[in-house]
């Protein structure tokens, strides 16, 4: 029997390297054991330089959507004002999650296939004239291939309101 392994270029699932497939065949370690605590501690320490963080790293064993939901629920309260930048399917998913839990969801629509224009977005925030707790966006809106200027946006948001949370669904290169 011949085994075919397709080349997957989607956001998930992705191909698993042979070394990891081999490691999966090792004996299981109990998640409440001392061995597991040591493995987890080593993993957390090893992830800090990968993400360029001095802060604690959290591992969530869930889908990307669950991580988006967890980030929202741990940043803002139900009566806070939050802003979602929607420029494709994943921004729309952020919006759907937000509308499930929050009373004051402000949606900043960007034409699908276009990146957010930082100055226009800051003008939008000023016109809202409400205390915004958090802004949510994506580094790369995978559904359209658009990369948002999150570094510039992060700096502009900090200048606008230093207490504002800026949550980016993306990789370590997109962190401000």
Language-model segments: which ranges?
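N-terminal "arm"/small-domain region of PLP-dependent enzymes with the aminotransferase-like
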Residues: 1-33
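Conserved PLP-enzyme active-site core in the AAT-like
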Residues: 3, 10, 14, 42, ...
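Conserved N-terminal alpha-helix of the aminotransferase class I/II PLP-enzyme fold
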Residues: 23-70, 89, 93, 97-99
């Amino acid at each position: 029997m011949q085994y075919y392994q397709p080349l997957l270029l989607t956001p998930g699932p992705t191909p698993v390297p042979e070394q990891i497939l081999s490691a999966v065949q090792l004996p299981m370690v109990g998640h409440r054991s001392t061995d597991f605590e040591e493995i987890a501690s080593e993993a957390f320490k090893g992830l800090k330089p990968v993400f360029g963080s001095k802060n604690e790293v959290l591992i969530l064993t869930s889908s990307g959507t669950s991580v988006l939901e967890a980030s929202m629920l741990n940043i803002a309260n139900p009566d806070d004002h939050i802003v979602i930048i929607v420029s494709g399917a994943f921004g729309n998913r952020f919006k759907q999650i937000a509308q499930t839990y929050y009373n004051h969801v402000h949606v900043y629509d960007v034409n699908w296939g276009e990146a957010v224009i930082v100055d226009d977005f800051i003008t939008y925030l000023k016109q809202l004239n409400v205390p915004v707790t958090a802004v949510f966006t994506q580094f790369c809106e995978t559904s359209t291939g658009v990369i948002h200027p999150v570094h510039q946006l992060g700096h502009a948001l900090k200048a606008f309101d230093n207490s504002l949370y800026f949550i980016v669904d993306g990789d370590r290169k997109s962190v401000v």
